[in-house]
Curated annotation (Swiss-Prot):
One of its GO terms (cellular component) is cytosolic small ribosomal subunit. It comes from Cupriavidus metallidurans (strain ATCC 43123 / DSM 2839 / NBRC 102507 / CH34). It comes from the Bacteria. One of its GO terms (biological process) is translation. Part of the 30S ribosomal subunit. Transmembrane segments: none annotated. Belongs to the universal ribosomal protein uS17 family. One of the primary rRNA binding proteins, it binds specifically to the 5'-end of 16S ribosomal RNA. Pfam families: Ribosomal_S17. InterPro entries: NA-bd_OB-fold (IPR012340), Ribosomal_uS17 (IPR000266), Ribosomal_uS17_bact/chlr (IPR019984), Ribosomal_uS17_CS (IPR019979). This is Small ribosomal subunit protein uS17.
Length: 92
C-alpha cells in the first residue's frame, strides 16, 4: 500500500454499533450509542443515532455488533459501509 493510500483510508471515520434492522436490500441500520456528560448537571447521559450502512452481501443480521466506515454518498441516506463484524448476535 502506498503512503497516499494509507493516509486516505485513515481519514475516514469509523464507528462501532449494533444492527437494529436488516429488512432493506443491501442496507442495514446501525445504532451508535455514546455516553456524554451533561454540561450543567454533570450526569452522564446516553445519546444515540442511527446510520444506514451498505451491506453488499446481506450477511449482517439484527443484533450483530459491526464496525462502519464513512464513504462517499451511496444514496440519499446512505454514506457508510460496514467494514467488519465485531461480534455476532447471540442466538437464544
Amino acid at each position: 500500500m502506498t503512503e497516499a493510500a494509507k493516509t486516505e483510508t485513515s481519514l475516514r471515520r469509523t464507528l462501532v454499533g449494533r444492527v437494529v434492522s436488516d429488512k432493506m436490500d443491501k442496507t442495514v441500520t446501525v445504532l451508535i450509542e455514546n455516553r456524554v456528560k451533561h454540561p450543567l448537571y454533570g450526569k452522564y447521559v446516553l445519546r444515540s443515532k442511527k446510520y444506514h450502512a451498505h451491506d453488499e452481501a446481506n450477511q449482517y443480521k439484527e443484533g450483530d455488533k459491526v464496525e462502519i466506515q464513512e464513504t462517499r454518498p451511496l444514496s440519499r441516506t446512505k454514506s457508510w459501509v460496514v467494514s467488519r463484524l465485531v461480534e455476532a448476535a447471540r442466538v437464544i
